[in-house]
């Protein structure tokens, strides 16, 4: 999404409109009072973690991630379209890749998290209806399978 350039709200002292790609934050904005100054942005927030194990099958841990999208545009139609475009481009990229991860200690890329799409775990996308113009926001809920934790030994947690 680095190539998606959107307008930034003009601040006191600005003489011309600035543009940039959405910034990405984990869990929350660094300064929640500056939410309007930070637009456009995406915040990824981890919400409930759920581990289950069906008899005779592997343990499965799924985490939900709420991605909150925000953009600015002085034109109402352009603002709504910019938000929908930002959310749709993100959704399409997720569906193309379906796996995310990091770099291991050996320098190789590791796919640690797999997108889960099933009747109980849908990819949901909702633009907010509130009248917040010239700011536009929405959210997407995704579910991710975490790596299985291999039990290596029996330990007593409470002695």
Segments the model singles out, each with a brief description of its role:
Residues 45-50, 67-73, 94:
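Generic secondary-structure microfeatures
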């Amino acid at each position: 999404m680095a190539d998606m350039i959107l307008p930034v709200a003009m601040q006191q002292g600005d003489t011309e409109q600035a543009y940039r790609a959405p910034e990405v934050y984990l869990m929350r904005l660094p300064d929640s009072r500056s939410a309007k100054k930070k637009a456009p942005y995406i915040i990824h927030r981890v919400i409930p973690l759920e581990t289950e194990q069906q008899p005779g099958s592997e343990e499965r841990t799924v985490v939900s991630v709420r991605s909150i999208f925000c953009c600015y545009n002085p034109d109402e139609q352009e603002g709504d379209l910019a938000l929908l475009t930002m959310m749709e481009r993100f959704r399409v990229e997720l569906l193309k890749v379906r796996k995310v991860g990091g770099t291991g200690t050996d320098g190789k890329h590791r796919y640690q998290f797999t997108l889960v799409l099933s009747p109980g775990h849908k990819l949901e996308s909702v633009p907010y209806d509130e009248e917040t113009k010239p700011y536009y926001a929405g959210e997407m809920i995704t579910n991710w399978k975490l790596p299985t934790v291999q039990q290596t030994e029996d330990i007593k947690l409470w002695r």
